[in-house]
Amino acid sequence: WDKMRGVLMPERRRRSITLEAGGHGYQNFLNASSDGGALFGAHPEWFGMDEQGERRREPRYVICTSQSRAVEYLIDSVKGYLRAHPEIDTFAFWPPDGAKWCRCEACRALGSDSEKHVRLVNRVAEALREEFPHLRVECLAYEVYLDPARKNVLSPAVMVDFCPIDQCFETQVDDAANPKNRMYATAFRQWRDCFDGQINLYSYY
C-alpha cells in the first residue's frame, strides 16, 4: 500500500472506496529487527519459544502473547502505523501464514492456537477503540483458526473473514452433503451460532 499510496489516494477519494490494509502481519509490528535489531537481545522472552525451549527470531514465530509488555509493544507499533495511515478503514490483523505459536508453559496454558489468536485480537481491538473509533479490526477464521474459540469469545466489534481455502466450488460452501465442504459447513454454522458480529466470506477463485 505504501508504494502506491500517492497514486491511489486521489482515486480512492474520487470513488468513495473503502480501504482495508494489513494481512498476515503480526510480525510487522514486533520482530527481531525491531529497534535496529536490538530487541531480541534486550527481550528474548518476548519472542516465541519452539518445542525444544528455544526462543526464535524467525518472523513466522508469533510473539510470546503471555508477555504483557510484548503485547503492549506490538499495540504501540500498530497505533503508530495507523496514525501514519489515517485513511485505513479496516485493519486486517492476521497471524503470519503458517504461524508457529509460542510453546512456553504460560502460552500453553492459554489453550489452542485459535484461543491465543482470539485473545490477542480482542486485546488489540480494545486498545485501538478509543483512538480510532472509525476503524474496524478484522481477523481470520482460517486453517487452524477455522473453528471459533470457546474460552475466549471474539468481540462482536471485530469482523471475521471466514476462509474456506480448500472448498469445492461444485456446490455451495455450506453444503454439508459435499465431503470437501462438510467441515466448512460445520465451522460456519458454529460461527453463526456463537458470534454476533459481522462475518465475511473470504473465497478463493
Where are these regions (language model features)?
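Aromatic-lined carbohydrate-binding surfaces of glycoside hydrolases
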Residues: 1-205
